[in-house]
Amino acid sequence: DEFDLENILDLFIDPTDGLIGPFDFANVIVKGKMGSGKTMYLRANYAYYLHTLVPCLLEHDSIILPVYIKLSDFQHLKDPKEIYDSILVKIIEEILAVCDHLKSAEEMTRLHKGAITLTGNWSTDNALIKIGNRLKELSADEYVEKIANSCETKGGIVNHFFEVCANYNKSKSIEIKSHRTPEFSDVVYAMRELITPFNGKLLILFDEIGSINKLFFKNDENGDSYFEILMNQLRTISNIRTKLAVYPNTSSDILKETRYGDVVALECDAINHPELYSSYSIKIISLIEKYISKAIEEACSSEEIFDISTQNQLLIEQLINASSGNMRRLVHLLDSSMNQAYKRNNGNGKIILDDIIDALKKQGADMENLYQSDDVDFLINISKFCKTRSTYRFSYPNKGTTISKFTNNSEEYNIIEIGQYGTGRKGTIYYFDYAYCIYKDLPTHYIKNSEKIDKTRSHITGDPIRRVAQLTDGLMAQSMVPGKIDGEITFLVADKSAGFIKGNDDREYFFSNKNIIKDDVKRAYYVKHKVRFLPSFFTDNEKKEISIATEIEVL
């Protein structure tokens, strides 16, 4: 939202793969959590088609008119019909607003700057490439003069376009806004009067859909919601396409059929899907280079700023893991890591892995500081429990309400995330945020084909931990017992009723199955099984010290 339109395409990273392009004239549903880049995607489309609109008019080529609508403008409305009517009016208003936008000489200069840079980079349309090449031959002043002449010349194509818009605005538009309830036929009429004479098409970009009242997405008595009615009406017009920004698994995420458009997913869970890492990391490196190059106004490679190479990108991988596919958070962490590097050496040298780790620890601490001391104690106890189980995932039956305060804070500051919602007798599986794992030294990866902790946390040397620690109030109480140590079973009698444990203090401890805590008494255990216990020491009649393991947790 903070970027000017002429800068959007310089900073835009194409999230699509394969034959699908980000600026195809097609129906698209853009899905992603808050901060994943949905608005950037739609604004880039708006900038792209706005930059090419007047050049296409000048060359008598078919035009595509972009209309960008933020539905948050209607979040104060409650009645679904009123929301529907307001959107119809907004579509027509925005078509006319584009016309006014194009009349400004200053705006034409900015659009010229955008137009001469975008065509070679983004367009696969031969006509647009030719137009772009001709534009590059003109200076900004010459471009504005050419458009001004076309605007002032009677019969000029741009003049004709502006006249049509002005005449429509004087008659039909004012009538709709002032005197009667709008109908979808008004949009059809506006298309026929304003765009069809120029062999034109309309691209409607709907942003912030999730901000409007949920009733807009609920089915009425006839079976369809007003949202579905609107989308079906737009879908049936051959020269209209829509691109929508939707939060997944919310009330607005109801368009499941492909007739409403292909889905562009703006999330990437690179930890749990390492096969996505390679293509995603290329996009991240491109983002780094685009943002820095734009800021310093000269080309800059990521290797000039970060201590990375083609063979070693562990530094970037840590940022990718911590961002969880959230672009806004990624940029924040990039900024924070650069700040850590600057504080470390006053701007000399590159950003190194230690700077990234410090930035992630700071992020984890900042997240924790959002909570009261009792909540922090609860978090610390769960994290300690998970650490003894060599995981960062857990389930905690009947604690959903308590845990929800850590999962519902925001998309960027949730210390705990939901990995899998509980169904039936299966409980919900939670996991700690990656930055918080770094802050609390929680393990996230095993070394490949083993259960040894991979401290590098890399997909090259390790696999993400899938183990889920099963928490109960009893186990939570045990995790807070002072003096407990870790150990490993070294010997069991035939019926497994007793045996010996070697503690991490290198002492041998006798144990009986009666010493196992109630929550774990039914769990299987075997030689080399990891346990946690409270060491107890007794002196027998011969004054020999006997070491016994009590309060045993089977890990």
Located regions from the model:
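The catalytic "switch" region of P-loop NTPases
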Residues: 181-312
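P-loop NTPase nucleotide-binding core
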Residues: 26-27, 32-202, 212, 248
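OB-fold/S1-family single-stranded nucleic acid-binding modules
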Residues: 536-555
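C-terminal leucine-rich, beta-strand-based interaction scaffolds used for sensing/assembly
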Residues: 322-325, 329, 339, 346-484, ...
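A short, basic N-terminal segment
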Residues: 1-28, 52-57
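Short nucleic-acid-contacting surface segments enriched for D/E, G, S/T with interspersed K/R
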Residues: 516-534
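Conserved AAA+ ATPase small/helical "lid" subdomain
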Residues: 105, 109, 285-350
